[in-house]
Structures are given as C-alpha cells and as structure tokens.
C-alpha cells in the first residue's frame, strides 16, 4: 500500500494533526503501533513509516566518501528526524521545529507521495499548484515516462 491523494486538515492547539484514515491504515500495517518518522526537507515535513525510514538510513550510511553537500543534506534530513507514534485518535504531533521549518501555522495539506507523505502549510502549497508545469512533460519523456492525461 502506498500513500496517495491529498487531504486538507487543521492542527489542533497542541500541534496535533489527524491523519486521513487511509494514511493511518498504511502506517498501522507497515509499522508496529503506527510508529513513523517525521523530518524536514523541501519546505515541508515528510512522514515515513518507521521501517521505511530505517531502510533509508541504512542505505544512506553505505555512501562512500560523501561530498560536503551530501553530508550537509544528511545533517538536515536525518538530524531533524523525530520518531513519533500515532495516538489513540490517529493523530501525530508536529514539533515546533518542524512547524517553523515548513512555515506551518494551522491549516495544512497532506500529500501522498508513494512510500511517504508530505505535510505542507496551506499557503506554501497554494504557491506550488499555481506553477507552470509545461516543461515537466519533456523532463518525464527524457526519463522514459510518458504522461498522457
């Protein structure tokens, strides 16, 4: 099962976010107790089921002689990772540091991204969807992916 779709949500006053039912089901099926890792990157908060995150960390640790930029990336992404667990109501708490990084105040958009999901501030996400994506079709075609909608 993969994370798919978009959902608009609001954080409660304690910074907790109610995940969509299908996201909760995926977390519960892939991680004992619904454990997940939240990290910051790309102007949003990313959520991974714990086993998927651990696999990512293992792969990352096998890099031979990583560049300074790669080490800085690791500092940002792995250094900001926080182990979380869904509460009894299917909520996850978003830390202040993640909220600050992603510009999250209250209203958010959750986006399924396959093996992970992203949590975006509503305003930042609105800026993404208004972009012109005409050049993306050519980039996909260069990668052997035809997007025929």
From Swiss-Prot:
Residues 6-52, 81-124 form the SpoVT-AbrB domain. It is found in: Cytoplasm, Nucleoid. GO terms for biological process: negative regulation of DNA-templated transcription initiation. One of its GO terms (molecular function) is DNA-binding transcription factor activity. One of its GO terms (cellular component) is nucleoid. Pfam families: MraZ. The keyword DNA-binding applies. The keyword Cell wall biogenesis/degradation does not apply. PROSITE patterns: SPOVT_ABRB. It comes from the Bacteria. CDD domains: MraZ_C (cd16321), MraZ_N (cd16320). Its main location: cytoplasm. InterPro entries: MraZ (IPR003444), MraZ_C (IPR035644), MraZ_dom (IPR020603), MraZ_N (IPR035642), MraZ_sf (IPR038619), SpoVT-AbrB_dom (IPR007159), SpoVT-AbrB_sf (IPR037914). Keywords: Cytoplasm, DNA-binding, Repeat, Transcription, Transcription regulation. NCBIfam families: division/cell wall cluster transcriptional repressor MraZ. HAMAP family: MraZ (MF_01008). Forms oligomers. Belongs to the MraZ family. This is Transcriptional regulator MraZ. It comes from Nitratidesulfovibrio vulgaris (strain DSM 19637 / Miyazaki F).
